[in-house]
């Protein structure tokens, strides 16, 4: 089956079948990255560019690595040293990149909806690598892949998303993705970090961590996004940690085999204790590995012409 769409801008409009296709395609991709020789010629002759207007370690690097593992020519545009700093408009930047012959652009931008604007104004395929507080589809896909790999299914799981829901594109994409599989999704955090009307997305909202994680299969911890916040949303990081930090002790109300996820980077001692972050229950490093596999799957499906098999 081919991923029959030009762009991947979010999970909200992605069907369950398309989601399953991406997750299933990531399985052989992970086999590739776990072997000694990781290079396959599948996308030889294709060209990929990453354009990040916000800082990134995991997403940008994993997309670059995914492209190289698939033999695509992969270029990272450094916005801080580009003509953007000379006042070049977004539209002109995108057109300049397009006429160089790139097939696909991976874009991150601080303003919600920017990748959608770009997709409407270029022939290149576009993958949204995070747009403001809107969506981060590939993060949610790698989270879902990690959960399915460990649990064997995504069907009807109980999932708690903890922390800064208001500013989190990761939370929104996870809600859109997991809801396709009938998951019981709970969001928990301070009232000032809970977006109004979040229940309209089919989730239950909580302000008590103990209540929210009672009997859950998965806990996805969100980073406190200090760079997006105005002052006064909560009294202090210390008070936030007292109420919402996950530690081995706070997991007592969850299931014994609960999975603990975090998109990174983590703020140790704020959202998650170092003891829990470094424990076997926390899948933070596995998420990073799976992120490469998911992004390889997307590049293959979007640039590989829909071939049924990977070329080894």
Curated annotation (Swiss-Prot):
Question: Mind telling me which NCBIfam families this protein's record contains?
Answer: asp_carb_tr, PRK00856.1
Q: Write out the function statement from the record.
A: Catalyzes the condensation of carbamoyl phosphate and aspartate to form carbamoyl aspartate and inorganic phosphate, the committed step in the de novo pyrimidine nucleotide biosynthesis pathway.
Keywords in alphabetical order, please. Pyrimidine biosynthesis, Transferase
Pathway the protein contributes to? Pyrimidine metabolism; UMP biosynthesis via de novo pathway; (S)-dihydroorotate from bicarbonate: step 2/3
**Keyword Ubl conjugation, does the record have it?**
no
As recorded in Swiss-Prot or TrEMBL, the protein's gene is named pyrB
Catalytic reaction(s) noted: carbamoyl phosphate + L-aspartate = N-carbamoyl-L-aspartate + phosphate + H(+)
Please identify the protein, giving its name as recorded. Answer: Aspartate carbamoyltransferase catalytic subunit
What biological processes does GO assign it? 'de novo' pyrimidine nucleobase biosynthetic process; 'de novo' UMP biosynthetic process; amino acid metabolic process
At the top of the EC hierarchy, this enzyme's class is transferase
Binding-site residues, L-aspartate: 86, 169, 223
Provide the species name: Syntrophomonas wolfei subsp. wolfei (strain DSM 2245B / Goettingen)
Binding sites annotated in the UniProt record for carbamoyl phosphate: 58-59, 108, 136, 139, 264-265
The organism's lineage is: Bacteria, Bacillati, Bacillota, Clostridia, Eubacteriales
Annotated family = Belongs to the aspartate/ornithine carbamoyltransferase superfamily. ATCase family.
Q: What Pfam families is this protein classified in?
A: OTCace, OTCace_N
Task: Spell out the subunit comment.
Answer: Heterododecamer (2C3:3R2) of six catalytic PyrB chains organized as two trimers (C3), and six regulatory PyrI chains organized as three dimers (R2).
SUPFAM superfamilies assigned to the protein according to its UniProt record, in alphabetical order:
Aspartate/ornithine carbamoyltransferase
A GO cellular component term found in this entry reads: cytosol
């Amino acid at each position: 089956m081919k991923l029959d769409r030009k762009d991947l801008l979010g999970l909200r409009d992605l069907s369950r079948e398309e989601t399953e296709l991406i997750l299933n395609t990531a399985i052989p991709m992970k086999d590739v990255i776990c072997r000694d020789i990781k290079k396959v010629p599948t996308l030889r002759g294709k060209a990929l560019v990453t354009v990040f207007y916000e800082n990134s370690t995991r997403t940008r690097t994993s997309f670059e690595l995914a492209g190289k593992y698939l033999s695509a020519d992969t270029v990272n545009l450094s916005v801080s040293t580009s003509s953007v700093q000379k006042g070049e408009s977004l539209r002109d930047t995108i057109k300049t990149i397009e006429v160089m012959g790139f097939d696909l652009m991976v874009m991150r931008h601080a303003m919600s909806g920017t990748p959608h604007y770009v997709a409407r104004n270029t022939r290149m395929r576009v993958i949204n690598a995070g747009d403001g507080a809107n969506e981060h589809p590939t993060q949610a896909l790698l989270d879902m892949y990690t959960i399915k790999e460990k649990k064997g299914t995504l069907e009807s799981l109980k999932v708690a998303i903890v922390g800064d829901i208001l500013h989190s594109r990761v939370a929104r994409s996870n809600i859109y993705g997991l809801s396709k599989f009938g998951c019981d999704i709970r969001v928990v955090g301070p009232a000032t970090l809970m977006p109004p009307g979040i229940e309209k997305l089919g989730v239950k909202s909580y302000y008590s961590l103990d209540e929210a994680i009672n009997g859950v299969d998965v806990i996805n911890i969100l980073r406190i996004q200090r760079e997006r916040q105005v002052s006064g949303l909560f009294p202090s990081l210390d008070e936030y940690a007292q109420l919402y930090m996950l530690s081995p002790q706070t997991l007592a109300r969850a299931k014994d085999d609960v999975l603990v996820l975090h998109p990174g980077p983590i703020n140790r001692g704020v959202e998650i204790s170092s003891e829990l972050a470094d424990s076997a229950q926390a899948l933070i490093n596995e998420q990073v590995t799976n992120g490469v596999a998911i992004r390889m799957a997307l590049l293959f499906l979007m640039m590989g012409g829909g071939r049924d098999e990977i070329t080894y």
